C-alpha cells in the first residue's frame, strides 16, 4: 500500500465527519418532534441508545481516522456514500418538520403511532438536520479531495471486483425494495361480533411508504432510493481496495441503522409490529457488512516472478 501526503481537504472531510457524528449522537437524546401534542424521543433506554448510536459512532470513528491521515481513501469513500444517502434523508426530515401537516397522516416515529395534525420541531430534529447537512457537505468536499489523494495498492482486489459488484447490485435492488415499505407497521385488527361470533379483519391505517408522501418527502424518497442503488453499484469499483471498503461500509451502516430502527420501533410499542421488509432490510444490511468484511480481508494469491 502506497499512501502519499494527505491533502488538507481530506483532513477537512475528517473534521466534518467528526462533527456530523457528534451532532448526530447528541440528536438522539432530546425530544425529536412534538406531533399532535405527543412528544417523540428516539431514546428511552439503553437498547434505544445503542440503536441510535450505530451510525454516529461509525461516522465518528471514520472521521477520526481520516483526520489523522490514516488510509484516507477509505474515509473519503465512506464520506461520499454517506453524504449521497444523506441528501434524500435531509429532504425527508425537512418535510417531517415543516410540511407533514399539509396532508395529515398516520406516522410511526420512534415507536409512537401519531397523526401529523400538528408538528412542532424540537432540539432533536434541529440537531439531526445539522448532522445530515454536515454529512452532505463532507461528501462534496470528499469528491473534490478524492483525485488529490494519493493512495494505491497492488490491485489485490481486482480479481474479486466483478463478483463483488454483482453481489452488491443484487443486494442494492433488494435494499431499495425493502426501503420502499415501512420497516414497522400497524397490524390489522380482528373484531369479533359478540352476537354471531363472526370475526372481521379491520385494516388500520399505518405509516406511509417511502414514495407515498408528497412534496419534499417524495423527492427525498426518490433521491434516497436512487442514491442507494447507485452507491451499491459504484462502491466495489473504488480504488484502492480500502476505498471500496469505505464505500461498502457507508452502505452497510446506513442499512443496518435503518433496519435496527424499525426493529426498535416495533419492540417499543404493542401497536406496531416489525414487517417483512424490515427484516429484509436487516438481511441486506448484513449482506453489505459481509461484502465489506470480504473486501477488507481479501488477499489475492501472488504469482512469484521468474528468477525471484
PLM ranges: what are they?
Residues 2-308:
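Compact integral membrane and secretory-pathway proteins
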Amino acid at each position: 500500500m502506497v499512501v502519499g501526503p494527505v491533502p488538507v481537504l481530506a483532513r477537512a472531510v475528517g473534521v466534518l465527519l467528526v462533527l456530523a457524528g457528534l451532532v448526530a449522537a447528541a440528536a438522539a437524546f432530546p425530544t425529536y418532534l412534538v406531533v399532535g401534542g405527543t412528544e417523540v424521543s428516539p431514546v428511552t433506554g439503553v437498547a434505544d441508545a445503542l440503536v441510535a448510536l450505530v451510525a454516529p459512532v461509525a461516522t465518528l470513528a471514520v472521521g477520526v481516522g481520516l483526520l489523522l491521515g490514516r488510509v484516507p481513501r477509505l474515509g473519503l469513500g465512506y464520506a461520499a456514500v454517506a453524504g449521497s444517502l444523506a441528501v434524500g434523508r435531509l429532504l425527508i426530515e425537512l418535510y417531517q418538520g415543516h410540511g407533514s401537516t399539509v396532508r395529515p397522516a398516520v406516522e410511526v416515529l420512534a415507536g409512537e403511532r401519531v397523526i401529523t395534525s400538528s408538528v412542532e420541531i424540537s432540539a432533536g430534529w434541529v440537531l439531526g438536520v445539522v448532522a445530515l447537512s454536515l454529512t452532505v457537505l463532507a461528501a462534496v468536499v470528499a469528491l473534490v479531495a478524492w483525485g488529490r489523494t494519493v493512495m494505491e495498492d497492488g490491485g489485490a482486489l481486482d480479481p474479486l471486483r466483478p463478483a463483488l459488484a454483482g453481489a452488491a447490485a443484487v443486494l442494492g435492488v433488494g435494499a431499495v425494495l425493502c426501503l420502499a415499505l415501512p420497516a414497522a407497521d400497524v397490524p390489522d385488527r380482528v373484531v369479533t361480533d359478540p352476537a354471531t361470533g363472526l370475526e372481521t379483519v379491520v385494516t388500520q391505517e399505518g405509516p406511509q411508504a417511502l414514495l407515498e408522501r408528497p412534496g419534499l418527502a417524495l423527492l427525498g424518497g426518490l433521491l434516497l432510493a436512487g442514491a442507494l442503488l447507485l452507491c451499491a453499484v459504484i462502491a466495489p469499483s473504488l480504488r484502492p481496495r480500502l476505498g471500496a471498503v469505505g464505500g461498502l461500509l457507508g452502505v452497510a451502516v446506513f442499512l443496518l441503522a435503518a433496519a435496527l430502527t424499525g426493529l426498535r420501533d416495533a419492540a417499543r410499542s404493542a401497536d406496531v409490529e416489525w414487517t417483512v421488509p424490515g427484516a429484509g432490510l436487516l438481511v441486506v444490511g448484513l449482506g453489505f457488512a459481509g461484502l465489506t468484511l470480504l473486501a477488507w480481508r481479501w488477499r489475492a494469491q501472488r504469482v512469484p516472478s521468474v528468477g525471484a
